[in-house]
A protein has these predicted regions:
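Amphipathic alpha-helical segments of tetratricopeptide repeats
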Residues: 77, 110-111, 149-150
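Alpha-helical segment of the N-proximal tetratricopeptide repeat
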Residues: 9-50, 54-60
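Short hydrophobic short-linear motifs embedded
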Residues: 7-8, 174-179
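Structural signature of tandem alpha-helical TPR/SEL1-like repeats
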Residues: 27-37, 62-74, 98-108, 135-144, ...
């Protein structure tokens, strides 16, 4: 009696699942509840990388990019080579307009990506395309998109990103022609 079996979720586990569910609902009205739950999880386990990653996602979803950056830095301080953390750091830095730093973080995530994190590949490529495009590196953005489609051939997200990246690349190569009057 009173024994806990490994298969039984703890309060902490239930809180993280609740945060994931609330984030997954895509309803901004639920973000306050998600924030309360993730804060409670962090009170229980302040060194939890997963909780800090979720805190970053909640802050990002509410538009608080500085809080998202602080949360992801807390996660990366505890697990500096975690691909998901490096991805989120890149995404948040991109949102803050710090594109070169964002690109470095995304590239670092690619370098440490293992088979277990294959689910992250499509998002990494998409974020890389977005950042390269924001930097005005349209040829590189198109190439990254093509590489992403090669690795994730069924990606509707990358196919959707290819057209704007390609248009930006072509637009950048057009010359202004002076007409005679």
């Amino acid at each position: 009696m009173g024994e806990r079996y490994d298969s039984e979720p703890t309060v902490y586990d239930r809180l993280l699942d609740q945060v994931r569910e609330l984030l997954g609902a895509g309803d901004d009205a639920l973000l306050v509840e998600a924030n309360i739950a993730v804060n409670h999880a962090l009170q229980l386990h302040p060194d939890s990388v997963d909780a800090w990653l979720l805190k970053c996602q909640v802050a990002s979803a509410t538009g608080d990019d500085l809080a998202a950056l602080a949360a992801i830095e807390m996660a990366l301080r505890r697990s500096p080579h975690r691909p998901e953390g490096l991805y989120w750091r890149g995404a948040v830095l991109g949102d803050l307009g710090r594109h070169r730093e964002a690109l470095r973080s995304i590239e670092a995530a690619f370098r440490v990506l293992g088979d277990a994190e294959h689910w992250l590949l499509e998002d990494l490529f998409y974020e890389k395309v977005t950042i390269l495009d924001a930097l005005g590196l349209h040829d590189a953005a198109v190439a990254a998109c093509a590489a992403g489609l090669e690795r994730c051939p069924g990606s509707a997200l990358l196919r959707a990103a290819l057209a704007p990246a390609e248009r930006a690349r072509v637009r950048g190569s057009l010359k202004v022609l002076r007409g005679g009057a």
